[in-house]
Amino acid sequence: MSSGERVAKVVLVDIEGTTTSISFVHDVLFPYAKQNVEKFLRDFWKEDDIKHIVQDLKQVPKFADYKALLSAPPTEVDVELIAGFVRYLIDQDLKVTPMKTLQGLIWAQGYANGELKGHVYEDVPAAFEAWRAAGLRIAVYSSGSVAAQKLIFGHSLAGNLQPHLSAYFDTHVGHKQEQQSYENIAQQLKEDPKQILFLTDIPGEAAAARSAGLQAIILQRPGNAGLADDQKASFELIPDFKPLHNLKLPINKSQA
């Protein structure tokens, strides 16, 4: 099925490499979190939500591995230890939910004080408008926390895009290369999986979504990873959202 012939009721978008450049995430957001995590923890260490995040971080299996790497492991959990562990997780690109939650809080400060603006590709706002006008819902599924997702779209270079978005999903619903995650999303959206179109840059995510019954298209944005020949043969590939501007709702047979 070509892009121009597709119908759907929901467009489910990934962020990194799909709506937003990978370089923004890796070259702007991650370094900002690394640079500011220790100060943020010192400022809010006694707040209940931070205490809960710290407790969750201590339960991450990699926490013991990280402490074993230290020449002089501390006898108690303090700001410096947790900040170092978060920087370690970021460097390893490990998508750990409490770390993502903490990153989201740090980024919230950056967006609020104007130090950060969310990058979106120039074709994204027009696509969002077209899909909404056609009656489709738009949802987001990213490994970044829901809070972080809302910040990117709420403080984007194109302004506040949140009014276009009806739902957000992160790793609380499951990991992105697992079929069950997409089944969970379809259930939460109360939608037939085949009426959901998932847009991503990762073949493993597209395969997991398709195995759950969703439609899936892979974005080949500048800077995205190259694809093997079998991956190119398995999925429809598009360079941006423009081929999908005419996406429509399925025809209601009772009205046809």
Swiss-Prot record:
Function, please? Bifunctional enzyme that catalyzes the enolization of 2,3-diketo-5-methylthiopentyl-1-phosphate (DK-MTP-1-P) into the intermediate 2-hydroxy-3-keto-5-methylthiopentenyl-1-phosphate (HK-MTPenyl-1-P), which is then dephosphorylated to form the acireductone 1,2-dihydroxy-3-keto-5-methylthiopentene (DHK-MTPene).
The UniProt keywords, alphabetically, are: Amino-acid biosynthesis, Cytoplasm, Hydrolase, Magnesium, Metal-binding, Methionine biosynthesis, Nucleus
Q: Which Pfam families match?
A: Hydrolase
Quaternary structure and interacting proteins, as annotated: Monomer.
- Residues bound to Mg(2+) are 14, 16, 201
Task: Name the top EC class.
Answer: hydrolase
Q: Does the keyword Hydrolase apply?
A: yes
Q: What is its EC number?
A: 3.1.3.77
Entry-linked Gene3D superfamilies: 1.10.720.60, HAD superfamily/HAD-like (3.40.50.1000)
Subcellular localization, as worded in the UniProt entry? Cytoplasm; Nucleus
Q: What is this protein called?
A: Enolase-phosphatase E1
| Cofactor note text | Binds 1 Mg(2+) ion per subunit.
Q: Which family does it belong to?
A: Belongs to the HAD-like hydrolase superfamily. MasA/MtnC family.
Q: Which reaction does it catalyse?
A: 5-methylsulfanyl-2,3-dioxopentyl phosphate + H2O = 1,2-dihydroxy-5-(methylsulfanyl)pent-1-en-3-one + phosphate
GO terms for biological process, alphabetical: L-methionine salvage from methylthioadenosine
Coarsely, its chief localization is cytoplasm
Q: Which residues bind substrate?
A: 142-143, 176
Q: Name one GO molecular function term.
A: acireductone synthase activity
InterPro entries xref list: Enolase-ppase_E1, ENOPH1_eukaryotes, HAD-like_sf, HAD-SF_hydro_IA, HAD_sf
The metabolic or biological pathway listed in the UniProt record of this protein is: Amino-acid biosynthesis; L-methionine biosynthesis via salvage pathway; L-methionine from S-methyl-5-thio-alpha-D-ribose 1-phosphate: step 3/6; Amino-acid biosynthesis; L-methionine biosynthesis via salvage pathway; L-methionine from S-methyl-5-thio-alpha-D-ribose 1-phosphate: step 4/6
The UniProt record lists the keyword Transferase: no
Q: Which organism is it from?
A: Drosophila simulans (Fruit fly)
* GO CC annotations, alphabetized: cytoplasm; nucleus
